[in-house]
Amino acid sequence: MNTLLSKLKGTGVAMITPFKSDFSIDYDSIKKVVDHVISGGANYLVVHGTTGETSTLSEDEKVETRKCFLKANDNRLPIIIGMGSNSTNSLINYINESNLNGFSAILSVVPYYNRPSQDGLFQHFSKVANASPYPIILYNVPSRTSCNMDPTTTLRLSKNKNIIGIKEANPDITQISFLINNTNEDFLIISGDDESAHRSVLSGADGVISVAANAIPDLFSKKINSALNGNNKKSNEFFEKINPFIKLIYEEGNPTGIKSAMFELGLCENVLRLPLVSSSNDLSSHIRNFISNY
């Protein structure tokens, strides 16, 4: 396994984008959040994903937040940048026109809304990977895209030298199991589901890109590291401790719950951009109780 792939094993964190009360980006809080997850034992960062509310950022804000995350990280960990589109040519142009110096790879989501066929998905990602100067990690999340990438399609794409892995967020465990059992070791299998991640890792996956690890990187990293070391008992102990929190932060959707948790930790304001809204008083109270006791 090459050096980059080995660095992308373990716990990646799907980073939030902090906002101020006036909905502008809180660049100072980006530094606080980055320091928090790194000190908690995260292995790498993922910016401009779903959790980062990327669809609400202007192009100028995307450029500035990229710079801010890179500066805050200060070369301590690899950083993956999220870039996706339901227009293949637009995505290729966007990748090649963007300054991505400092990023290790691109996380690219399955095209959404227009629901391509499996052959369309294969052609889309093949063309993107062949045109990209950076390695591509596929991202399958059918609950958001309304399009599932079949594991046999992923297997075909894994033969492309510039496609180095997949974040698999299909809740059907048989899908990630197929990939674990049929891909080569130089293709990363990354869970995209906080709740089942340790079970996937115990079965042979390489790690997780986690939402919950924004708030509790220490416990989450210990859970995943225990699983990577084959320690089923220890991994399950951490799972039992943090699973109530995982359920809470997804109760009203992501990133509503995790933003509430980060506020309780004093790391940022509990502010989201419309059409997303902050957590209800009831959920905020439950999250506050967990954070104060964990």
Regions found by a protein language model. Name each.
Residues 40, 64, 68-73, 97, ...:
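Alpha-helical structural signal in soluble globular domains
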Residues 56-57, 91, 117-118, 148, ...:
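Short Asp/Glu-rich motifs
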Residues 44, 68, 72, 136, ...:
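Residue-level detection of beta-strand scaffold positions
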Residues 140, 162-163, 273-274:
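Glycine-rich phosphate-binding "P-loop"
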Residues 30, 62, 66, 91, ...:
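A general structural signal for well-ordered alpha-helical segments in protein cores
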Residues 144-250:
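Catalytic alpha/beta core domains of metabolic enzymes, predominantly
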Residues 2-13, 17-146:
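Active-site beta->alpha loop and helix N-cap motifs at the rims of alpha/beta catalytic domains
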Residues 7-18, 36, 40-41, 202-205, ...:
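C-terminal alpha-helical cap/extension of soluble enzyme domains
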